[in-house]
Amino acid sequence: MYDTLKIIHSLLRWLILLAGFYAVLRSLGGITGKKAYTGADGKAGLFYMIFFDLQLLVGLALYFFASPLVGIHDMAGAMKDPIIRFYTVEHETLAIIAFVLVHIGRAKTKKGTDAQRHKTALLFFGIALLLVLALVPWPFRAVGAMQGWF
C-alpha cells in the first residue's frame, strides 16, 4: 500500500506543477496582454485546485496510515534529524499552506474586474507554486537523495 500511494503522490506532484505553471502563465499573460478573464483561465485554476485536493488526500493517507517514518510518534527525536523533520513537519506544513492559498485564490478569482482576477490568480497561485517547489523532496536535495524524479 505504501509504495502504491507514494507513486500516486509523486505522479500528482507533476500534475500539480504542470497545472500550477499553466495557471500562473495564463494569469501573467492576462495581466501583460490586458486580456479578459475567460473560462479557460478559470479552468486552469480549477484543475490546479483539483490536483491539490487529490494530492492532499493521498498525502494524508501516506502520513497517517502508510508511512514507515515514525517521526509523528517521537516529535523530539524527529526535530533532531533534518530528513525526518522535513517529512514529519516541513513538507506537510508547506503543503497545507499552499493548498489553502490555491483554494483562496480560486475563490477570489470569481469576482472583480478581469485585471483584478488575473492579478489575484497570479498572486495566490504563484505563491502556492513557489511553496510546492520548496516542499518537494527533489533528488538534488538531501531529503530527496534516495527518491528519484518519479
PLM feature segments, named:
Residues 1-150:
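Membrane-embedded alpha-helical bundles that constitute the cytochrome b-like, heme-associated redox core
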